[in-house]
């Protein structure tokens, strides 16, 4: 198998891994609020838009490195009244949890691939 074929195969595997387990939801307290019922619900559905991979010259843990570009549909609301937002509108800790889930899933199945995420 040529290096290009290996990269194409990894591209397909990354897409399958991310796109298969691609939903998250939860709620967060509104900033600067001390009321226990002042919160927002959120839900996110994401899919891979593009994968950019290359073989690492010298590697200890990562044989392949790259970036995964993600399209994310973000909905924020309260009691079922949803509005569409972008990933940057979520609190940073929620975005971090989403990134961690995606990266953990990739690392679990492809430990020799080290990628970062970019949300479109």
What does each model-identified segment do?
Residues 113-120:
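Short acidic DE-rich linear segments
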Residues 2-41:
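Negatively charged, low-complexity tracts enriched in Asp/Glu with abundant Ser/Thr
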Residues 27-112:
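Acidic, low-complexity, intrinsically disordered interaction modules
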Residues 19-22, 97, 105, 120:
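Detector for Asparagine
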